[in-house]
Every structure is written in C-alpha cells, then in structure tokens.
C-alpha cells in the first residue's frame, strides 16, 4: 500500500545512506508561462527559505543527454528521479515530468498534494490535474503574485503534450530556451528499463521500501471499492494450522529410540539443502568494455564526451579508445576536467582490459597474478608521478584548481582499491620526509585524506610520527621561528593527535631521545590528561631503549649524588639548598648522616672546609627535625677505630656541634652509661671513650662537666692530665706573647712546640683563652698618628704583626678556623696596615671555610671600614690595598667596593709615577749605594718622600736590591722578604720599565751558574706580587722550547725540579709561622694549584721524565711529586683521574710509577710484592663511594701491567666476581671500575654474565606430577636478576653488528617458556573441579615465575635487538624462521589469560613480581608487562623484514588454535600489518613457521582461558571472519583472520576492484556487472 503523501512517511530524500544522482536536464512549468509570469514566479525566491530543494518529480519523457522527440518514445517504461528530493511532503508529478521552481512547493507550509506520487505511462497527462487550483482556493504563489501586482495571477496554461514539449539543455545551463530553439537529436535506441531510485530507503535484503512501478498487474494497481476506501495492504498469509511451539511434535519423536538420530538427519538435510540453494553456481558473465583504435580527432572527441556529464557512460563504453593509459590518462583527465567519477570509470575500463590481456596470453595462474601485481605497481607509479608533477608546479596558473582535482582523483583511486596501498602510502611518506619546507603544507593537507589508512598499521604510523617530528625540528630553528609559525602550529596539532589518539605509533626505539623535547612542546602539560599520556609514552620508550653510552650505563647512585652535593658546597657555599637537596635525595636519614661523616673524614678529600660544611648541614637537618644525635652515635658505634678515616675531623665536627649546643652532651653521657663502655677495663683507644675526652667543656653545665670527669676517672683517665696539658700550652703561648698574656700565667716556662696529639677539649679551651686575651688587648686612650694627637677608640686592638702571626700559627695548627674567624674579627679594629693586610690574607687563604661558616662578607666589610678609617687619618699602605682587592675579587657582591679600591690603588701608583725626581737622585752613584751603612734608611726616605724617580735611579736601586737577593753583598742585613718588599715599593714609579728589568734579570739568573739561589728568591718575589707563579712557569716553558736559549741554561732537569718544589705546600707538621710575604706566597701557591691543576700535572710529568732521562729520579723528587700529586687527587678527583688515565695510556712509565706510589699511600695498599691479581682483589675489596676514582686508576695501572706480563684473564675474573658480589650487596661501584677497562675486558665480563644467566633453569619442577608441581625457587630468580643487572649495565659493550650467537638462544628460551605455559594451561583445563590447594599454590608459583622470566627475556631481547638482524653469512630462511618464532612466542605469552591476570597487573618496573592476589588489586604505576611485551614486539617488527612479519601473521591465523580468541585483537593487525591472503591470490602459502609449542603436540589442545571448555575457543573463532583478500578494504569486517574448518578454507568472496564497473556493456544483459557478494554475507568456499 502507498499511503497518502500527508501521512508523514519518511521521504527518500532524507535517507542518509544514498548519494544524490545528478538529475537530467528538466524544465520548469514556469517555462510555459509568459515573461511577466515568469518574473512573478521568481520574485518570491529572493526570500530566504529553510531548505532550497526541489520536489520529487517523475520524469517519464526525457533521458539525460537525449533529445525530446515529438513522437512517442518506445514502449519500454522508464522511471527517473530528480537530483534532489523535497524536504516537504511529496509533491505531485507534472505531466511533462519537470520540477516546479515555485516557492510554494519548496516551503514546509505548502499545501499537500491531493494525489499520491505514482508512476504512469508516458502518454498519460493526468498528473497535470494537480496544477489546477482545487475548490476555488488560491495557492500561495497566486497570493504572492496578487500581493505584488495588485491583481489576480493569470490562470495556468493548458497541459502540453509530452511529446510536443521540448526539455531544456543539460543540467548546469541555467538559461531557459524555447522548444523551437532546441536542436534536434537522435532517437534513443537503448531499450528502456526501470531503475530503482537511488534515494529510496533500502531495507534488508537489498529491497526498496514502497517502490512498485506501474505495470498494470500489481495488486496495488487494482482499483476497487476496498482499495479506494482503505488503501492497499501487504498482508502476510499465516497458516491456521501452525502451532505456537514445536515441543509436542518434537517430544513425540524423542520418545522413540531412533528419534534423536532422525531429528539429526532432518536437520542435517535442511542444512545441506540451504547450503545448496545458497551457492552461486552460474559463472559471471561480466566482461570489460572493449577498446577500439581511433584517430586522434575521434579520441579527443571521445574524451570531450566523457567530460560531458550529459553523455551516458553506456554509450561511451562502445568506443573506448586505445592508447590512453598510465600518466597520459591522468593528464588527459586533468586537461579535459573530466569529472572524477567518470575519470575513475575510464581508469577501471583501461585497467580491466590490461589485466584481462594477461589471461588471454595462455600463461599460468601464478604468472598471471605476478603480471597483474606488476601492472598495478606500474600504474601506482604513474599516479605518483602525476601528483609529484603537480606539486612541483606550485605557483603556476590555475595550480590550486588543478591540485584540488588531482588530489580528489588520486584519493578516489586509492579508496577504490585501484592502487597498490603499500607502494602508494610508502611513497606518500617518503615524499613527506623529503619535502622542503615550502611544500610541506601541501603534503599536510593531503595527509588528512590518508590519515586513517596510514595509522592503521605501526609500520606506517611510526614512520609518519618520525617524519612529522623531523619537520617540526626543522621549522623550529631560530631563523624560522616567526615566519613559519602557522606551519609549526599545524605540525604540533598533528603530533598532538598522534600522541593522544595513536600512542603506540609514538613508541620510537631509535629516535625518542632526539624527539622527546619536541613531543613535550606539542602537549599542554598543564592538562593532567596530556601530562599522564606523556609520562606513559616516555616510560614506554625508556623500557625499550638501550643506552650505548658508558656514562648513561653508569648513572650515579643516590649516595654518589649526595657526595657530589657535599663537594659542591665547598665551591658554591650554598648550604641551605644543599641541605634540602640531600634530604630529597636519600630518605634514609641514618645513611645520609653516615655519608656526611665519612665524607668529612675520608682521606680522598682534603681541606678543613669539609668539617664546617658538615657542621652547617647537620645544624640545618637538626632544625628540620632529623635526630642527628642518634645517627652520630650509631655511626661511631659502627665505625670504630677505622684506619681509613681521619677521626680527628669527626671529633672536630662534634666539638663544633657542642659549641653551638646542637649536639646533646648529656644524652651522649647517658648513652655511654647505659652502654657500659666506660668501665675501668676499657682500652684508651675505645672510640666512645676517645670522644668523651674530645668534648669541649667551656659551655657545659657544672653537673655535666662533673659527670664527664667521673666517667673519665672510671676509665682510668685522670682529669688532672687534661688540666696540666692546658697549663703547659698556655705557658708556651704566653711566653711568645708577653704583651697579651704577661700577667695571666704564673710561670713563663716556654714549651718548644705544642703537642700535635691534642684533644678538642684542650684545643677549644686554648682557643677560648686566646680570644679572651685578644679582646682585652686594646690601645690606650690616646694615640699619636702622623704627627697629630687624636682621641682613640678604646676598642682599637694593639696587636702587632708578630703577635698576629703567632696567634694565627697556633689556631691554624689546631685547625680551629671558627675561632680564627673570631680573632680576625677582633683584629679588624687594629690600626696597623700590616696586621690588617695579614688579616685580609688570612680570610683569603681560608676563603671556602669562612664562607661556609658565614663570616667572609662580615670580615671583608670590617676590613674595608678599617681601611677607610686609616685613609682618613693618613696614607694607607699598598699591602693593605692589594690584599683587600684580591679578597674582594672573590666576592661577587662586593664589586662596587673593589672598584673603589682599584681607584685608590691607581691614584697611589700614578702619584708616584708623576712626581718630580728627588734631589737625592741627581747623583745616583753617591746618593744610594748598597755598600753605604745607611742604605736602608736612605731607601726608606726615598720611597716614602712622595717624590718622583727617574729610570736611571730606579735601575741603580733595582741593581742594588737584586745584588742583595743573590747574596753578592753580605754587608747589608736585609732578608729576602724585606728586599722583595722594597722591590714592590719601587715598581709604582715606572711599572713598565721595572717589569722589563725584572724579566731580563730573571732570564739572566736562569742562564747563570748562580741559579742555586732561585728557590730562595722566587717565593718572596711571588709573595710581594712582583712575579706570579703562572707567569714564571710560562716564561721557563718558552725558554726551554727555544733550542738556542735552552742550550745556555745549565741543568734543565734541576730547573724543572726547582719549579716542582716551588709548588709543594708545607707539610702539616711544619711550623706555619709565616710573615706577610711568606703567607702571601702560600696563598698564591694555593691559588695556582686550584686554578691551574692541569699545568701542575704537566710540570710533575715533565720533571719526572726529564730527571729520569738525565740522572734518574732521586728520593727528593719522588717525595715532592708524590706529595703534590696526592694533594691534586684529593682536590679534583674526577678531573685529575682523567688526566692520569691519559698519561697512563700514553705510556709515561716514570709518571705511572710515581702515580702508583701515590695511590698506594691513598689506598693504604701494602701488598706491593703480591701478584697483580691479588692486588686487584685488594683494590676492589676496598672500593667505596669515595675511593672509586682512585681504585679505577689503580686497576688501570694493574691492567697495563697485566697486558705487559700476559697474565691472561686474571683481572677479568676478579672483576667479574667483584661485580657479582657488589650487585648482590645492592651496590654499584663495580660499574665505575669496569667502565675504565678495555672494551675486550668489558665484553668478556658481559659474556660471562650472559652465560650464567642462560644457565639458570626457568622453572624448578618437583618430582611427581610434572604439569602442576612448581616449587617456588626464589634463589634462582634472584640469581638470574643479578646476572641480568650486570648484563644491562654493560650493554654498551655490545658491538654495532650485534652478537649473533645470542639470538637463537633467546628464541629457544622463549619457546620453552611458551611450552611451559601451554602445558600448564592444558593441565588446568583437564583438571577443572579437582584442583587442590597445593595445585593452586603451585599454579601461583608458576605464574610468578612466568612473569619474571618473561620480563627478563624481554629485557634481554631489548639489549640484544641487533642480534636478530639478518647477517650476510647466515641463510636468510633460517634467520627469518627464528624471527617469526620469536614474535609468535611474544604474542602468545603476552596475550595469554592467566587466572590471576599477572601479566596485566604486574608492571615491568621490577623484575621480580610479588605474590599478590588479583582480588582488589590496583596496578602499580608503571607500564604493564603485557604492554611492554607488545612494545618490544613492535621494536622488533620495525627492524625485521616483511617476510618474518607475514610468516608470524600466517602462523597465528592458521596454525595456532589455542590462541584463536585473540586473532581479531586490533593489536595483532596493527603490529603485523597488512598480510596478503594466500588463498585468494592463488599462490601457495610459504612454509609455515614451526610451532614454539610443538613439544606439547601430544597433549590435548589447550585454551588460554581457564573459564572456557576445550572447544569453545574454536567455536568462538569459527564464527569470526578472517583473511585480508585482494580488493577488500583493510578496515572492513572481512579483513580479519581466515578459518579452516573440515579441510575447507572459509573466507570472504573476493571481487577484483577493477571489475566493480558500472555501465560496462553497451547493451543491458542479465549479469552485466560484477556484484560484490560480500554485501550479502556470502563466503567463498574452497576445498
């Protein structure tokens, strides 16, 4: 029944599944009106309408492109439909079959038609009745006409006969022509046939809803009373005898014994009947349209007709010209602007004929398939060339239109499956990679078309990700930052989409480190989603990456990072930041305090700055809530009297903490009494008792002091011994400083020197006593200065230079720098220039320690204030200005003060240089002579007179002073320091002339035989600033490089030895009573060793080599070199060690010998006569976080000795054992030791670890039932983890070509792991319902072991990824087979459904899974093991050839029944990529990969899911589509795995895309088109 048009049925034009067909040329009924009427009809169209669509009209008279004849057409009926359906109700059909362009029919308020839409014969004009106004009513268009013209519209004309009505021109020509002006056309000869409207709604089974053309014999065409009143209904005839259920009949049959068999036979017969009826037996009669040979003119005319949409394709199919193929075909389509759908039709016709030509040649099927594939590749290459040509023509005329057409055409060819997907998409990605920045936007626009196809498989997706990231890296260069900003935004958008929606394509094993920052810049890290995604991607990439750098493999442990922070404090002086960073680095506060105390006392560091750094850090941690008292006592208990630690520094730290009341002495005494170590039978050397003796007593309460003395007395240490020592020291010091302590000490007995073995209780008491004495040593109420009596401040210190030198000597020998800082603070109130200069030099010498204490800035400001006071009262001394400038240069915040001080210095020097010559210089020969007894007084008068000095006078005085220095004049009693100070005062008069004379004198001294005085002359010259150590070393180096000058220098070896001695600092036990000049020399010495340590090492090496070649190395030279080298090693461990390694590799035997002695002293090695291997064991055994660089050096020395003595693999064995032991103890020092070994030695250690790893059994099975009894073998897992750690850390030793022998072992291990899994799953299925608790526990043990071994083997695969590459020497088939087996094992294990889901719940952050039940378990942060396994498989597939990937896919599809339920997993198709179906291509499949679980073939086929019966997986998979046939879209349902059932392969019905051709035959036949039976869910069955 066809309901009324107003019944509200769905209109065909609304159906979204059907495209609109271009309608034929039609004429509006308005064309029959006059011009004025036509204008009235068009006027309302200017108003905006909701939808501008034409009503549906049945065309019974015209055909697209045909001429309307005046005679009736043939009697074959035809039904055409307009191009656009109406959005309103169904409109009536006009007699001439044309739509009406009236506003009334296109608006939703139009009056519904009184007649239903009905097709009628051509000669019928009854439809024109609908044009006549009914019931005298006025239509809306008439009302509009009346409103505009003011009079009623003219009545419509009479109907025009259809065969007398001329239709307009073809669609697209908007002009309306009269009937007479239409050109005459030929009569249509093609028989008319009814066509289903393309916009009709399609029902199931390809039926069209409510479409029954008028034939006269349809039930709907019968007009009777019932149909006239009620309409026509399609009623289903239901049999009255049918019952509601089949139970009674079936139940009766089941009562009989043979009833069940009979029913089975009936159902089997019904199935066979249905199968026989469903088979298509008739072969296809489709033939491609033939091609004919045409002339050029006819070919051009044919192409123009093809470009004309009004010319039907069926007519053009008769004369398809030869010679249009390849790129020429595409160029013709572009030049003629042939519509895309018609251009694709031409390409299909040409392609179908080309492919059909291969079959007509009588070749075999396999050859035909090969030729067809070759032709398709060539055709794809032509398409690529066509598109490349257009892209290269960018900027030409009409380029945009041509490019738009070309992109649309090539996209249509691609999606019609007329191109080779792999070749075309590969070319697209290659073009994007090679595109210049100017053409990248064009390729990005095309990228949106092929985005889904590219991202469907990892092979393409990863390549696209790298290409986009590389382009983004190029355009983000600074020179393109602004001009290419839109391109940067577009690339960032694509990359962001990749990361968010296609995360697996951004897993880049080889380039993640290069593009990581770019990926981060494309994301919004403020968004939690983007942040989580980036962290996930970064972690996944880190899991599958292998560092090839030694530095990365040996990353610092937390302990080493903390030690680096400790070292940095001594140079940065930022205690607060370091304290916070240390607390964040190590959570174990006990370990943190232990490392700090060990760093303070280790012999592998130097300087008292460590002590005060430790004190400040401990005080910071104390304020942060850390119980440092407990941790310090715990450290002392564990340490004992360790000879390797300088315990005096530990006691110094504790004494400083006691001074600042940070360390609780009372709590320590309680701990001692509770411990009971202070009994009378304890030894004096007990560390607890020794600390008790070290505690300062100055600020302790009386009861605590009494308790300490009591405990000491019980331990056998009388308190009077400490008091007597303090009294002796005070007497000794008071004897040297009578002006300060003259009345405080009863006796003045002078002690030669204070004992070095003094406790900090004594040192602290002496320091407090000295500070009190200095604070009371002040000047009188008045003083005379510069001849003027001025009132003096009572707080002005009366210290003299000698007194300051003595006090500084005592405190520096004690190491009590905090007390020295207080003394210097009190000294700043002195008005003596020398004392203030010495105080500034003292601060400069202990700069790092004073900075850590926090006193440097305050002391510098106080010294500057004293300098300003002296400047107001008189002329300050040059020494003070020099000292303040040198100290201020080390304080960045005091740059303004230094600038002012430099101005003062320049003013003083310029004043001396510009002053007029003194009268004393008129006769220099008699004025000043070193033989004159009054030489010194005259010189003082000359230098302090403020007058000038000419160059001759300066030369005379300079000669006199140098004679005194060289000892030529012994009558003048001037020391070297005083003489050099005079030289320094002489220099400001003429600095350049003085420097020239000094250089000539030094060069002459080097060449003279009296050079023995050089070691005594240089230190004071350096101390006063006339000579610098760096300048002198550079001068000697230049002189020795010149052969002419070097030949005049006597004994160059001794000269180099003197330079070396010049750099050796004084020994700790040596007296440090230094005056201003000597102290400055040691300050310059310290500065040179810190800044120019490399030059110092060169001096040592040069002196050793020169003296060894001359007369051998004496003990003095060896001692100096050893002392200096040890100091440098402790100051700059890492840099000096690297220098020494270079010297060792350069075969400096003498330097290596001295270096070995130095290392023996540092490492306290005494087994010098033992074999090298024993020494190596001792060195490795004593390695810790501090001695690591020195042990590296020592082992390198031993390794060189081993190579000379050919000791074999001795040290390699020792190092391997050390690596195992250190790894078992959770240490990492062995990494640093191995890093310096030769590559061959490192490779041997790694190979031994790999051998031991592969020797560990995978599972420890118990006796009895081998299938379910798995005992927990934690020891084996820990051992495997240990060796795996060693292999991972030494992965950088793997050569670039890989280790080919490891690949087959890993494949076998993975096969064995899969075999164990299959056996376990089979046993679980066969024992369902009878599993005991023991079996459950055994299964859990098995799963945990499986997770560990799977993770460990995956890590080994990542490490040895290059081992699976195809070498030239190995047969390719064998390598491909191993690669496929490895992929199969990884896929099967990773997707196996274990009962506890341990592979999904257990992250791969740790190799050892913990026994946690899956109930209520939340996955830990990290990448799940399953995801990690698939990432590893992806990294392998990136490097494997396509053959391995295809073999793996075929095996998983065809011969892996236990895992059929995962065959349709998207991850399989994404990783393995498109695999051609061997069955549909008529090519026999290649040899299948052997099953990794072949050993389990005798067991029943298991299923990975324990909840499914044995056959459920097969039944589930058999209902799933499979295979990727030729011509089927990749993303359709049919592009999945094929199934094998009862010897037959079931797959989708294949249809060649070249044969899906419409209008192929000139005459309509029964089966003239290729139908894709896939739409009917049909399958092709092959036996």
From Swiss-Prot:
Low complexity composition-biased segments: 102-114, 1490-1514
Protein family membership: Belongs to the Mediator complex subunit 12 family.
Pfam assignment, any one: ARM_SRB8
Principal location class: nucleus
GO cellular component, as recorded: mediator complex
Origin: domain of life: Eukaryota
Described purpose of this protein according to its UniProt entry: Component of the srb8-11 complex. The srb8-11 complex is a regulatory module of the Mediator complex which is itself involved in regulation of basal and activated RNA polymerase II-dependent transcription. The srb8-11 complex may be involved in the transcriptional repression of a subset of genes regulated by Mediator. It may inhibit the association of the Mediator complex with RNA polymerase II to form the holoenzyme complex.
A GO molecular-function descriptor: transcription coregulator activity
Region (Disordered): 1-117, 1481-1525
Organism from which the protein derives: Aspergillus terreus (strain NIH 2624 / FGSC A1156)
SMART domains, alphabetized: Med12
Keyword Nucleus in record: yes
GO terms of biological process kind: regulation of transcription by RNA polymerase II
InterPro entries reported in the protein's UniProt record: Mediator_Med12 (IPR019035)
Biased composition (Basic and acidic residues): 66-79
Keywords assigned: Activator, Nucleus, Repressor, Transcription, Transcription regulation
PANTHER family tied to this protein: MEDIATOR OF RNA POLYMERASE II TRANSCRIPTION SUBUNIT 12
This protein's name: Mediator of RNA polymerase II transcription subunit 12
Coiled coil: none
Subunit record text: Component of the srb8-11 complex, which itself associates with the Mediator complex.
Localization terms from the record: Nucleus
